[in-house]
């Protein structure tokens, strides 16, 4: 839940797709058509198409190229500041909040975004690399159903992707490090539905977000409320100003009518005009972790007025 949840569009559209001379529509059509023709998983076929396209254009899918691309990912409004605010809100009440990523995007890109240090663990697709550091095969493919395995890993405190034994061992509910009832899952659409339903049905909360700059983007999420798959629907604007103006009210649960064209976010103008990346670039220095001074803002009236934080706290964290 990174693309469309914390950042608009798909991360492959920033640098890779323009670099191979394809439009966003062409690349995703080819990948999905391959999946249909071969009756294959769409995540695996998009990863395979990346390798095929790079080879055909003489590009090198180096880890460093993905990392460089991650440093240029554009986030939704307020995302950078969100973590400090919600962490401070929890700390003021003796609650430690942990953040995880569970995404069908590329881990190599996500791990170099400016908010990567905020996450305890990033579960996402990744490649195997040869001795020269060039991607040659998918290592992890995270689709809409196997995303749920990572929810169980988080629940049981299993952080390794490789480990398949501990996650299947029986652990009493009250002894699990992260109980389902304490989980809040934030996602943007169909690839998150199984996880949203799992978390909600297990006593946690699921929140669906949409790109506020895409017309009628909210409408296709109304069915999630109707079908009792999510607890809350709101725009993907994490800024404090937005919250204070009331955009994250409980009223946002109420349904509208109509529909939204599928894949609207995929062709978002936010990602269509990026410059192609040279896939032989060198890695840049890593980001320093931000020091969060939670004590100074525990009693901040702006935080107390933050409607979305209040929603999460009053409807979830208080009901354990």
Identify the function of each model-found stretch:
Residues 1-131, 228-230:
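Alpha-helical substrate-recognition element adjacent to the catalytic core
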């Amino acid at each position: 839940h990174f693309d469309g949840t914390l950042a608009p569009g798909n991360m492959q559209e920033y640098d890779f797709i323009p670099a191979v001379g394809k439009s966003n529509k062409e690349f995703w059509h080819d990948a999905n058509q391959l999946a249909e023709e071969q009756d294959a998983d769409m995540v695996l076929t998009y990863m395979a198409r990346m390798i095929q396209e790079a080879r055909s254009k003489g590009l090198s899918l180096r880890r460093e190229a993905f990392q460089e691309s991650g440093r240029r990912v554009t986030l939704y409004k307020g995302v950078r500041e969100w973590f400090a605010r919600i962490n401070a809100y929890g700390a003021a009440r003796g609650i430690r909040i942990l953040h995880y990523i569970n995404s069908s995007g590329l881990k190599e890109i996500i791990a170099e975004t400016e908010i990567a240090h905020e996450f305890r663990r990033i579960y996402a697709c990744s490649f195997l690399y040869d001795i020269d550091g060039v991607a040659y095969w998918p290592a992890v493919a995270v689709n809409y159903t196997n995303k749920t395995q990572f929810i169980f890993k988080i629940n049981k405190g299993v952080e390794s992707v490789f480990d398949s034994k501990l996650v299947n061992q029986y652990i009493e509910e009250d002894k699990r490090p992260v109980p389902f009832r304490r989980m809040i899952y934030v996602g943007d659409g169909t690839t998150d539905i199984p996880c949203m339903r799992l978390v909600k049905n297990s006593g946690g909360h699921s929140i669906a977000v949409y790109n506020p700059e895409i017309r009628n983007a909210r409408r296709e999420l109304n069915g999630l409320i109707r079908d009792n798959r999510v607890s809350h629907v709101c725009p993907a604007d994490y800024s404090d100003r937005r919250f204070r103006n009331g955009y994250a009210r409980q009223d946002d649960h109420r349904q509208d009518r109509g529909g939204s064209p599928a894949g609207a976010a995929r062709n978002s103008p936010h990602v269509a005009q990026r410059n192609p990346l040279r896939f032989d670039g060198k890695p840049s220095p890593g980001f320093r972790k931000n020091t969060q001074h939670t004590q100074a803002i525990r009693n901040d009236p702006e935080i107390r007025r933050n409607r979305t934080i209040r929603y999460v706290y009053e409807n979830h964290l208080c009901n354990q």
